[in-house]
């Protein structure tokens, strides 16, 4: 099961809205790319590199400068952030 922390869900919604507003049609493509990344994470959650202890991992979103940051908790995936790769690195660490 994949669960989004509330702040991560808000980030994703805000980023989709940004792409829809500023780049017509891109919000849908961004959302699809995040969904594909989540599918890959669900299939092989431990395949992605550790960023920080304990067990914080990150998977790149194809074609967009974003990463899905997550932890594995009891076999489930908790998404901590859908983070822009070049803005405010590590801002989501306090969400653990």
Listing of model-derived features with the role each one plays in the protein:
Residues 23, 27-30, 49, 56, ...:
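Residue-level detector of alpha-helical recognition elements and their boundaries
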Residues 1-33:
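Arg/Lys-rich, positively charged N-terminal/basic patches that mediate binding to nucleic acids
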Residues 2, 23, 54-57, 64, ...:
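Short alpha-helical segments used as structural interaction elements across diverse proteins
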Residues 66-67, 71-96:
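Enriched for short, Lys/Arg-rich terminal
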Residues 23, 45-52, 87-90:
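Short, charge-rich, low-complexity interaction segments located
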Residues 43, 47-77:
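Basic/aromatic recognition patch in beta-strand/loop cores that engages polyanionic ligands
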């Amino acid at each position: 099961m994949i669960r989004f922390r509330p702040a991560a869900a808000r980030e994703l919604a805000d980023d989709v809205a940004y792409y829809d507003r500023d780049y017509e049609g891109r919000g849908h493509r961004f959302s699809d790319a995040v969904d594909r990344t989540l599918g890959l994470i669900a299939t092989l959650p431990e395949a992605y590199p550790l960023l920080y202890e304990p067990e914080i991992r990150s998977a790149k979103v194809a074609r967009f400068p974003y990463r899905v940051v997550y932890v594995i908790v009891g076999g489930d995936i908790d998404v901590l952030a859908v983070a822009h790769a070049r803005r405010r690195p590590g801002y989501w660490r306090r969400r653990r």
